[in-house]
Structure formats: structure tokens, C-alpha cells
């Protein structure tokens, strides 16, 4: 093989190997940052992993908010109309957090079925609902009830449909 061709081949192979390594590292980093969304029904049915960070969303059950007297610990229940999941959070809740409103919590699911959230996102206006929560309510057949309650002036959602 001609020395010039051999040198070109080595350079091309080095470039291909470098690009391959860069793509591999990028895909690995992206995979670690993926937070899949799970509904309370999926979490209650055991479909959500307990060892990775997930997003869970739904409507905050009326009367479920429990605040600690001596710390920033908060517990509340989120529902999609079919099942419920308890969320534990340490920190200051967003200003727009209210019972009966849609939220998305990011955290890890404990072995006891409680989602330990490190971030809670509240919807930003009265009519907005996260797309994942809307889909979960639609799938459980509770979206129309929620919308009818909002049209009638209700400010909260309960599972019995009253």
C-alpha cells in the first residue's frame, strides 16, 4: 500500500472513531436525562420503575395536602380520576399550587409507592393543564367531568364525580 494512502486511511479511521465516540457519549448523556411521564394509574399498577427519576402528574385531591409544622415537608395525593398516588416533597410549593389543580412532580418512586419529589411544577393559569395530565384524564374518562366542573365554577376535583 502506498504510504500516502496508508496515512489517509489512518486519518479517516481516526475521524470515524472520534465521531463514533462522541455520538456514543452524547446518547449516553441523553438517556440519563430522560424523565418518562407516568399517570397515577400506571404507578399504582406497578408500571413505573422505582430506581429512576420519573415525572408523575394529575390533579391534586381536595383535602389531601398535609404540611409539616416544623419543616418544609409536604405530602399530597394526586389522582387521574381512576387511581391515586401520594407525593412527598421537601421545599416551597409553587405559588400556583392548589388543591384540584393539575401538577407534574419529578422525583423517584419509593418502595412504598410514594413518589419522593425533588421538583413540583404547577400549571400557570386557570385554563392550562399539562398535556400529559390531559391525556391521563381523557384515558380514564374523567376529562369531561373535570371540564364540566370548571364550567360550573367548581375549583376542585373529587373522585366521586360530585
From Swiss-Prot:
Subcellular location: Cell inner membrane
Matches recorded under InterPro entries: CcmE, CcmE-like_sf, NA-bd_OB-fold
Keyword annotations from UniProtKB, A to Z: Cell inner membrane, Cell membrane, Cytochrome c-type biogenesis, Heme, Iron, Membrane, Metal-binding, Signal-anchor, Transmembrane, Transmembrane helix
Periplasmic domain ranges by topology: 30-162
Residues spanning the membrane: 9-29
Key word Cell membrane present: yes
GO MF entries: heme binding; metal ion binding
Similarity-based family: Belongs to the CcmE/CycJ family.
Name the UniProt record assigns to this protein: Cytochrome c-type biogenesis protein CcmE
Species the sequence originates in: Pseudomonas aeruginosa (strain ATCC 15692 / DSM 22644 / CIP 104116 / JCM 14847 / LMG 12228 / 1C / PRS 101 / PAO1)
The organism's taxonomic lineage, starting at the top: Bacteria, Pseudomonadati, Pseudomonadota, Gammaproteobacteria, Pseudomonadales
Gene that specifies this protein: ccmE
